[in-house]
Every structure is written in structure tokens, then in C-alpha cells.
Amino acid sequence: MNPKVLLILIDGMRPDAVLQAEHPFLREFMRTRCTYTLNGRSVMPSITLPCIMSLFHSVTPDRHGNLDNMYVRPSHRIDGLFDVLYANKKKNLFYRTWNELRDLCRPGALARDELCEWKVYGNAADIQLCDRCAQAIRAEEPDFVFYYSGNTDEVAHKHGWMGPEYMEAVSLASRNIEKLIGVLPEGYSVVITADHGGHARSHGTEMPEDMTIPIALYGPRWEKGKELETISLLDLAPTILDILGCEIPDEWDGVSLLD
């Protein structure tokens, strides 16, 4: 059976929020069924587009040139995760609640790109998108799926990190993750992460509250209940390529966590 990967990113989800959330699934899943860390390291600036560009291209923002949420085409071509997988004839699906991620890969790399915008539907966007993603995984068993949820970050900017509204959003994320894990066919590995954390109603600094993220790795090649000290956001794309049996580009800075 060919290995497959589901990457789940919950925007702005702090590790201490995972520990304190009313909905227990994500917390218990990480602790009992994953190799994980509560001390993952984001990149500076700790802002969504720079962070996710760094995740997918395994380089720091100074190399890919995106320093805020306005996309800038890199001056030097760096193949991203979607692009490398497409070149290796892998089927990529992308589910997102934020339109600004539209330039994450080159045209043609995605078999499907589904957008359900938070600014139109609110937290219902996450619920609808999760249902669509779950249906596609069951029906198609794609090689790689990226599910991006922006609800937690949007709520935090409005009401504040670690407040009751934010914690409710983290619980919703936990419920959606449980739904996605529940439909996975045999052979899937899962990577769960955040792009950054946050403090008060903002983020983007080097404060631990902004830079520290949870990361969980689930699947047949990961030890259950093993806690790692530190994982960089830059290591996730190389790890996913390694799981899927694809060569890691030389220009990437991160390393596979399977090494």
C-alpha cells in the first residue's frame, strides 16, 4: 500500500490552548497516539503567510521573500511541497478558509483547491470545509491533503488569545480533527501543526507566545506517546516527502524527522 499524508494546520493554535481545551480529542490523540512536541518552533515574522510559505518551502522568510500577508513571488525559484509532489505524480488536494493562500503552489499542482472563506461564513466555514475534506478523503484516497483552518486565528484577533471565545474555537478545531482522523483509510500518516501562536489580540513577534507551536506526527512510522523537545516548522515538508518516498530538494533548509 502506498503511503499517504494528511497535513492539518490550525492557524494561531497555541500548545497551552490544546492542553486546556474543553474538547479532549486533540490533547489525548497527541499524548497517546503520536510523536509530538509542545515546543515546536515557528519562524519570524510569526505571521500566517510567511509561516506557511516557510512550512511548504522549508526555508526562512528572508529566503522566500514573504514578510507579511501580501504574497511576493520569490526572486529565486524554490520548489514547494505541492510542486515537488506533483512532479512525483502525487495527487494533491487543498482545503482552506483563507484566500491569501492561493499562491502556495504553481498552477496545475493541485487536483482540487477548495475555498470556504471565514470572512463570509464565520466558524461555519471550518465545519463545511471539514465535511468536504472528509468526503474527499473517503472517496478518493489522495496522496496528500492539506487542510487549513483559520477560525482560531480570526477569533483570537477579535476576542484575544486564550479567552473563552478563542478556547471555544480550539475545541471546534479539535472536533474537526477528530472527524478527519476518523475517516482516514489505512496507510495514512497525519501531521498536525499551527503556523504561529499569539498574545493579546496579535502576533508576529519573537515572544514565546507567538513562536511556540504544537506539532504532532501520527502513523505507522511514529512512536506513540513519544514527546520531542523541539521541532522546527521547516522540518515538516522534508518529513512529508520522506514519508511519501520523494527526494528532498537540496535548497531546503529543514531535515526529515524520520532521520
Tell where the protein language model's regions lie, with residue ranges.
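Feature captures the catalytic ectodomains and active-site-proximal regions of enzymes
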Residues: 1-259
